[in-house]
């Protein structure tokens, strides 16, 4: 455990999780700013021009997908050479930070022989990866 200023002890796994979440979030936000700048500057071609985006935002998702031709699920990966879709990479990175945090604390939990939390962390990783995979779909 890491000792804090007021004599409180913080478990090592919490420090690891918090550090990864903080720095990963910071990197992710910087990454989003860079990819957004690439989009609005026109450095890469885009499926939706910035000036058309606000009009598309006034409609539902189905209309947006129909007008842009973007596929649902992970199909957007095939379009990362477009500036507006490149933003999705940064967003996907931000979404993956929680999984990275859990993966990082599993060895610490194992070392502490904290079986319950190890099982919960592994289950969380599996559930998040399964949800992100698109294999399970509800309401479609």
Curated annotation (Swiss-Prot):
Top-level lineage group: Archaea
Main location (coarse class): membrane
UniProt entry keywords in alphabetical sequence: Cell membrane, Membrane, Transmembrane, Transmembrane helix
GO cellular component entries: plasma membrane
Entry membrane topology: Multi-pass membrane protein
Location within or outside the cell: Cell membrane
TM stretches of this protein: 20-42, 88-110, 115-137
Designated name of the protein: Uncharacterized protein AF_1562
Native organism: Archaeoglobus fulgidus (strain ATCC 49558 / DSM 4304 / JCM 9628 / NBRC 100126 / VC-16)
UniProt lineage: Archaea, Methanobacteriati, Methanobacteriota, Archaeoglobi, Archaeoglobales
């Amino acid at each position: 455990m890491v000792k804090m200023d007021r004599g409180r002890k913080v478990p090592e796994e919490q420090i690891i999780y918090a550090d990864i979440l903080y720095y990963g979030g910071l990197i992710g936000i910087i990454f989003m700013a860079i990819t957004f700048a690439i989009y609005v500057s026109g450095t890469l071609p885009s499926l939706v021009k910035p000036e058309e985006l606000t009009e598309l935002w006034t409609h539902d998702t189905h209309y947006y997908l129909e007008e842009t031709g973007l596929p649902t699920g992970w199909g957007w990966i095939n379009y990362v050479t477009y500036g507006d879709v490149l933003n999705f990479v940064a967003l996907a990175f931000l979404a993956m930070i929680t999984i990275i945090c859990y993966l990082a604390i599993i060895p610490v939990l194992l070392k502490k022989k904290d079986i319950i939390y190890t099982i919960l962390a592994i289950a969380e990783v599996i559930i998040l990866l399964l949800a992100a995979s698109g294999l399970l779909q509800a309401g479609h």
